[in-house]
Amino acid sequence: MRLWKSMAWGILLWHSQSGALCPAWPPARAAEEITRLQQQLADWNDIYWKQGVSAVDDSVYDQLSARLVQWQRCVGQDVSSTPVSPPLNGTTMHPVAHTGVRKLADRQAVEQWVRGRSELWVQPKVDGVAVTLVYQNGKLTRAISRGNGLQGEDWTPKIRLIPSIPQTTQGALANAVLQGEIFLQREGHIQQRMGGMNARSKAAGMLMRQDNASALNSLGIFIWAWPDGPANMPERLSQLAKAGFSLTKKYSLAVKDASEVERARQSWLTSALPFVTDGVVIRMAKEPASQYWRPGQGDWLAAWKYPPVAQVAQVSAIQFSVGKSGKITVVASLVPVILDDKRVQRVNIGSVKRWEAWDIAPGDQILVSLAGQGIPRLDEVVWRSRERSKPVPPGSHFNSLTCFYASATCQEQFISRLVWLGSRSALGLDGMGEASWRALHQTHRFEHIFSWLALTSAQIANTPGVAKGKSEQIWRQFYLARRQSFTRWIMAMDIPLTQAALQASGDRSWEQLLMRTEQHWRQLPATGERRAGRVIDWRNNPQINALSRWLAAQHIPGFGS
């Protein structure tokens, strides 16, 4: 199906000095859109941390938060107030600050980060809720939510109800501060196939609600930091395992370079794990003394996240395509995003009715994933722009019997018919894609779908946008098309039958086809009464009959006397 480009309606984009792709909004609209998105994120954030309820998927929240930061940078706005972390309601100080972890974008960034660093280890980046555990004299005395990294909520009563978290410790761990991730326990979770499952929100919800003590049985703990613990990493892991924190040892691997990090990352992505992950964390065994730990300053560790299964993409335009049958389909053009190494810049919305139900306009943020065979799929609208400027769809007068002849209103269906007749299902004109047909039609103004048969080799060679080698290929394909069977020419005329049914009919000429009754068509494979009626309508159509006479004049097999 071809795009109704004259009816497209979109938004302009520009690049900021920071290199970010920015909407070309007037200052007033930019301020309004930023404020609205900022408020929405703040509302979701508040619900998440106060009620333990996720109003939006974790990945969507993270991506929209990043989008907000991008917009703020586009207009030179301060980004420090962006609500991407929990509100500071807790006042319990962390004995050791949570540093957070720097994100590495790709393999190249990982190679650069590991260069010059030694004694490296890689661990799964468990997707859950960060916590500090404080042990004194062998007993768990405090449990504190991450908060802002310096202070957070006192979670001690809830943490004491989680069976998987040791309540007592011995030896070096009798008096220790541990940092880790409380996660939703899973059995045989394969990240690549099962995705994130909103595990972070579910874990947070269990910790925050007051009436679900039994649900805490499904939570686990993964310790990823023992500040001021043993300097030797194997010794550190061994002592943690003996104390009941066995997952840390099981899922910590020594690595030498980015290749080994990548292998571990891929293995954990495709293997059955007891938790949901969203990447890996690379860390140096040697860490500074805990007194020097500060939020945002943990340069001894970094994360390499998995690409999200679905991406939030900004709609840049709405376009309409008209297929050869006259069906109108709505397509959303997107600011390009990468999904599974595939560059996605458009997604099929479906019919006009479905588009109207989705209520999608340029500037909206939609969630896109890949369906079977890597086809982009619209999952949901996650954010709507304040301004609802939508194009008007083309009229509904197109059908399976329109646009065999070119006209101003038939442009897109006519091109769709040319693309179809050149496909392997019809005449099999190798190398004839939409761009080639558009170039020929724009220059030579075809009267109907077979006008190209009258082109000379010189005319094709002089077509702007068609290279010499390409023009020779086109001329040869057009020449060979004349030798195609009568059945293939009828398929090129878009008879409403399958090729198998048409072959079963046994027609070898237009005259023979005209003599067939509706009863004859009904008896063909996969035809029936309704399709037989459509064949009769097609055969009696004036444009189809005019095309048959023109093909006869061109001495196409089966059409002459």
Curated annotation (Swiss-Prot):
Q: Which SMART domains match?
A: LIGANc (SM00532)
Which catalytic residues are annotated? 125 (n6-amp-lysine intermediate)
- Look up the EC number in the record and give it: 6.5.1.2
Q: Catalytic activity, per the record? A: NAD(+) + (deoxyribonucleotide)n-3'-hydroxyl + 5'-phospho-(deoxyribonucleotide)m = (deoxyribonucleotide)n+m + AMP + beta-nicotinamide D-nucleotide
Show the InterPro entries listed in the entry: DNA_ligase_AS, DNA_ligase_B, DNA_ligase_CS, DNAligase_adenylation, DNAligase_N, NA-bd_OB-fold, NAD_dep_DNA_ligaseB, NAD_DNA_ligase_OB
Provide an example Pfam family for this protein. DNA_ligase_OB
**Top EC class for this record:** ligase
UniProt keyword terms in alphabetical order = DNA damage, DNA repair, DNA replication, Ligase, NAD
Q: Which GO terms describe its molecular function?
A: DNA ligase (NAD+) activity
The parts of the chain that form a coiled coil are none
Q: Which GO terms describe its biological process?
A: DNA repair; DNA replication
Role this protein plays:
Catalyzes the formation of phosphodiester linkages between 5'-phosphoryl and 3'-hydroxyl groups in double-stranded DNA using NAD as a coenzyme and as the energy source for the reaction.
Q: Which family does it belong to?
A: Belongs to the NAD-dependent DNA ligase family. LigB subfamily.
Q: Which HAMAP family match?
A: DNA_ligase_B
Name the chain's protein: DNA ligase B
Q: What is the lineage of its organism?
A: Bacteria, Pseudomonadati, Pseudomonadota, Gammaproteobacteria, Enterobacterales
